[in-house]
């Protein structure tokens, strides 16, 4: 196994860990109160900006994000599905970046995550 492949794997594990942290933050504020509060405050705005066509409640969208983050975590932890998981993550981060731009928020968090995912794809 080349060192580039090992780097891609470690970046994937890091992204999977962050995705699992997002699941926790969506479900409870016990371990990450500030992150959880930020997600709950911004979710209604993102719902109106990007997901208006779906007609979902903010609560339903929260659970959609939980399922998406669990899926990303599972894909990135699976050796066979990791390549697909990275590409899937990049597409979804693009949606998050678009939402940030539409709402006039700082795109830095999504840009950093896109860079990490892009690096993992590039060295794979």
From Swiss-Prot:
Bilayer topology annotation: Multi-pass membrane protein
Pathway(s): Mycotoxin biosynthesis
Glycosylation sites: 38
Subcellular location: Membrane
Molecular function terms from GO: isomerase activity
Segments passing through the bilayer: 64-86, 106-123
This protein's UniProt keywords: Glycoprotein, Isomerase, Membrane, Signal, Transmembrane, Transmembrane helix, Virulence
N-terminal signal peptide: 1-27
Main location: membrane
Enzyme Commission numbers on file: 5.-.-.-
GO CC, one annotated term: membrane
Family that this chain belongs to: Belongs to the pydZ family.
Functional description taken from the UniProt entry: Cyclic ether formation enzyme; part of the gene cluster that mediates the biosynthesis of pyrrocidines, fungal natural products containing a macrocyclic para-cyclophane connected to a decahydrofluorene ring system that show potent antibiotic activities toward Gram-negative bacteria. Within the pathway, pydZ functions synergistically with pydB, pydE and pydX to form the cyclophane.
Protein name per Swiss-Prot or TrEMBL: Cyclic ether formation enzyme pydZ
């Amino acid at each position: 196994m080349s060192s580039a492949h090992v780097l891609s794997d470690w970046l994937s594990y890091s992204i999977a860990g962050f995705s699992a942290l997002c699941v926790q933050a969506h479900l409870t504020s016990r371990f990450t109160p500030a992150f959880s509060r930020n997600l709950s405050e911004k979710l209604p705005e993102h719902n109106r900006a990007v997901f208006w066509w779906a007609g979902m409640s903010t609560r339903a969208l929260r659970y959609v994000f939980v399922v998406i983050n669990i899926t990303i975590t599972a894909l990135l932890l699976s050796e066979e599905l990791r390549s697909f998981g990275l590409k899937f993550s990049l597409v979804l981060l693009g949606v998050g970046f678009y939402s940030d731009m539409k709402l006039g928020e700082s795109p830095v968090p999504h840009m950093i995550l896109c860079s990490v995912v892009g690096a993992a794809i590039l060295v794979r």
